[in-house]
Structure formats: C-alpha cells, structure tokens
Amino acid sequence: MGPGSGQAHTQRGARVTSAERRAALEVIAAEVTACTRGRLHSGRTKAVPGEGHMDTEVVFVGEAPGMNEDRAGRPFVGRAGDLLVRMLDTVSWKRDEVFITNVVKCRPPDNRDPEPDEIEACLPYLQRQLAVIDPPLIVTLGRHSMGRFIPGAKISQIHGTSHPVDPTTGASGAMVYAMYHPAAALRSSDVERQSFDDAAGIPAALLEARARRIGPIDVAESANGRARATEPLPLPKADHRPTPTTESITMDPAPDAPTFF
C-alpha cells in the first residue's frame, strides 16, 4: 500500500515528467545545501533539504532539523525518524514512497523552536518543493509546520483532521492533514497513542484529497484497481476527520525511488 506514482498522479500532473521533477528537486536541494539566506546557516553542520520519492502523492512537512538531522543532512533520523517509520508501517507504507522535508532547513540552536524570520527565510524552498511534487495531501508534523498551512489553529484541537491548503503555500489544490511531531510523541504516551491513531487515518485522507482534486472518478481505476471504492468520495470539510479505511490504497511505484538530499 503506497502513495507512489501511477494513474492517480497523472490526473494531477500529466505535463510534468518524473525526470523533470527529479531535476527540479535536485536543483532545490543544491541551493539549500549552499544557502546563506537565513541566520541559522552560520551554526549548521549540514543543511537538510529533504528526501523521498519525486512522484509521491503525500509530502510530510516537519518543523526544523535536530541534532541528528544536522549531522546527517537528512530529515527525521534518530528516534523521531524511527517512530515516523513505525507510523508509516501501520498503513503499510515505506519511507521512500513519500517525501519528507521541514519548514526550516537548518538546525536552530539547542533544538529550540524556529523563529518567524527563520521560517520566512526558508519558505521559498518549501514552496518550490511543493509546487514541483504537487501532492494531493500534505501531512504536517508539529505545530510550527501546521501553523504554516493552518494559521491560528491549535494542534490539540485539529490533529487527525483534513483542511484545504491556501494556494500561496505552493501546494495548489492540496489538503493538509495535521499530526503531532514524532518528538512530542516520544515525550508522552498519550500523544504517541493519538499519533498512531492519526497515522491510521492518512490513507483515508489521501482518498479524500484525490477526490477533491480530480472530482468524481472511479477511485478503483485511479489506484490501478486495488482500491475498491466504486462511488464518488465525499468532499472533505474544513474540520473533517477522515473515516478510517481498511481498503488497500496502492499505486504502482515508479521504476526507481530516488532520494534527494
């Protein structure tokens, strides 16, 4: 069950090839690696552009790199990354089938929360990544990531729910699904339980995001015959919690699953 490429992706970006997406993401990654735009660059070991599959339908957006990410130049490594992989495992998805990035690309000192000016300095990179991948669904991890897409919301009130995305974020026509940051789940068993419950709702959120974007189609066809829905899916509401699904939501992966650093 994976959110990779397939017929559903061609519905949203038929004029953009995988090679073009790959090239565009590589350009962005190179720019992030060399970036000195924000004040965080002076204290970093490595910038963290993001990584994952160029043709995915789901992009996970965290807040900022931590110590482990700063050393590795990769998002969500260490214990938080392990927990995210476990959450993906619950819906039979693999890490390299999605794209994972952060709002801020360099580590804030002492793992503090990113400041508004630091978010603004990195924002063009996130906007371009989302515009290139053009995902139907964005999963935010943490309140600072959520705040970029749903300003003024409280994560304790809206986690596990889907919301329309403002086109100015770079993700035109997408939905956003809010979750707690895995690091918060590591600190609280209650948050961990809620996070796994929310992760179980991601496939249903993806089905609804597809339906909202491409309109009433045979969802089974869009998923290469493995998703068995035969009726048009309802459009998600702004405060809608997707109904969990037990369907296998699978699309054929691309021949390769490149990773971008």
Residue ranges and their predicted role:
Residues 22, 29, 65-66, 99-111:
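Short, basic/glycine-rich phosphate-binding loops at helix/coil junctions
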Residues 1-79, 224-261:
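Active-site and ligand/interface coordination hotspots across diverse enzymes
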Residues 2-9, 13, 91, 95-96, ...:
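Glycine/proline-rich loop-helix segments at beta-alpha junctions forming the active-site rim
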Residues 67-95, 99:
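Glycine-rich, small/polar surface segments that engage phosphate groups of diverse ligands
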Residues 46-49, 87-88, 167:
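Short, charged beta->alpha transition segments
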